[in-house]
Design a protein with these regions (language model features):
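Short, conserved loop/turn and helix-capping segments at secondary-structure boundaries
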Residues: 77, 277-288
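C-terminal helix/juxtamembrane-tail motif
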Residues: 292-303
């Protein structure tokens, strides 16, 4: 898929004509599954019931399995994986915990629950939009981002071209039954009607997001644009170890890794039925090496 990227949700009377369904009105269990959307603030929820009351470790709540949380495995959601990787780059020790958007105080994942050894001191969760600043303030080795004028232009390739192709390939292609279903739909409920409803909502949300940019959803166009974006990112990386020639990986490296790792993960969900986007990335050997380097240096314990 999982970004992000606001207007408050309004409670409406059941007698009122419901507004046209849009990306910003999906049910709570699936809101903001996609990286950076929907752009909606939901009422603050209580912390997950499994949240520890006496903690001496930071806990990052992400989309993951219970087994993955124990081993610190990379999240299967791009928005979560981005910040999971960035916190590792920042050398901040933390644990991961499995959650969903409905369990998040802000309505979206990821969020951090800082360590609190004092049982009488309440700690405030840190939403994804504030994680970079929190990391800078809490890391013994804060990451200095490169002041490159090209940064925003290249980051837009991730936020637009690659993200759109990701949405299509996960939620609208054949991968919807082999990846989206086992990761985002089946875990939500055992009720077949609920699962069917969530599946339809996910497809509709992805379609409406893609229709913001074109009146027709053309898979070949989306994949071609993503391929061009991968080519541009590979050229940008060149022979450097990290993007923009940095000495250590930063948030841009984390943003790229969030997509490249998941696309290169052959065992994601039940496997890839439509491999076109994955194949386009696999042809970019420097991006593959960049992903493998991060996986080996920062996620070795989860291998």
């Amino acid at each position: 898929m999982s970004s992000s990227h606001e207007a408050n949700a309004t409670v409406r009377s059941s007698k009122q004509q419901p507004p046209p369904r849009s990306l910003f009105s999906v049910p709570a269990p699936i809101k903001q599954l996609f990286d950076q959307f929907p752009l909606l603030t939901y009422p603050v929820n209580d912390l997950p019931q499994r949240a520890p009351q006496h903690r001496n470790a930071h806990v990052l709540y992400v989309f993951t399995t219970d087994k993955g949380a124990i081993g610190g495995a990379p999240s299967y959601n791009p928005a979560c994986l981005k910040w999971q990787a960035y916190l590792k780059f920042s050398k901040i020790p933390f644990q991961t915990a499995s959650a969903n958007n409905h369990a998040s105080p802000s309505g979206s994942l990821p969020f951090m629950l800082p360590a609190s050894p004092d049982p009488y001191k309440e700690t405030q969760p840190v939403p994804s939009g504030k994680l970079q600043r929190w990391a800078l303030n809490n890391s013994e080795s804060p990451i200095e981002e490169p002041g490159d004028s090209r940064y925003e232009a290249y980051h837009s390739l991730l936020d637009h071209r690659i993200r759109r192709a990701w949405l299509y390939t996960i939620y609208l292609s054949q991968n919807s039954t082999t990846i989206a279903e086992p990761l985002y739909i089946l875990p939500t409920s055992r009720n077949s009607f609920v699962r069917l409803t969530i599946s339809r909502e996910l497809r509709l949300a992805a379609e409406q997001e893609l229709l913001k940019y074109s009146s027709i959803i053309n898979d070949e166009t989306l994949y071609n644009q993503a391929d061009e974006a991968f080519a541009a990112l590979e050229t940008l990386l060149g022979k450097d170890k990290w993007f923009f020639g940095a000495e250590t990986p930063g948030v841009f490296d984390a943003s790229v890794f969030a997509y490249t790792h998941l696309l290169l993960e052959a065992r994601l969900g039940k496997g890839w039925a439509d491999t076109r986007l994955r194949d386009a990335l696999m042809a970019r050997k420097r991006l593959v090496t960049h992903r493998d380097r991060i996986l080996a240096e920062y996620f070795a314990e989860a291998a």
